[in-house]
């Protein structure tokens, strides 16, 4: 409730930023909150990841410390959706649609994967549709300066090769070129 004291306190502790979640609306009051949060975190040189928020609408142009915005039906939804989207197809739509608006906190990187016919929503042991390689590719395809790992630490410890790959992927790129793609079918992206 006292945003300035919270930001000051955590900045003094050496914390580098916040991931704020569960805003889940886009009315004027919430928009004002997001601007206050961006302004206050900038004042204390803190990064800001606005999860559970509408797609970006320019806030990060005024406050570059606001580095991520969810604004997407992220991978976490696979834990509880009774009628999940066709996730594989969805993931090759969002780079063409949502990604155009700016950085996206999608929370990819699932290590438990299943073919569409074997997939089921499970809150206690979440999984994703498709392959693990597809999950890894999302770290390159999706623009996200502050990537999250969606799975449990023990799953990444068991899959060290995947963890090493994710750790080596830059989060900021000098150039991005979509070489080819078809909405809902595939995307080929080159970054350097």
Q: Where are the predicted features?
A:
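Generic structural hydrophobic/aromatic packing signal, biased to beta-strands
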Residues: 41, 66-69, 106, 138-141, ...
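Glycan-recognition and catalytic regions of carbohydrate-active enzymes
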Residues: 151-192
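Generic hydrophobic, helix-prone segments enriched in Leu/Val/Ile
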Residues: 96-97, 137, 173
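Aromatic- and carboxylate-enriched substrate-binding clefts and catalytic-loop regions
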Residues: 1-127, 131
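A generic structural micro-environment signature
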Residues: 73, 110-112, 117, 142, ...
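Alpha-helix initiation and N-capping motif
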Residues: 103, 134-135, 159-163
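Long hydrophobic segments that form regular secondary structure
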Residues: 116-142, 147, 182-184, 191-192
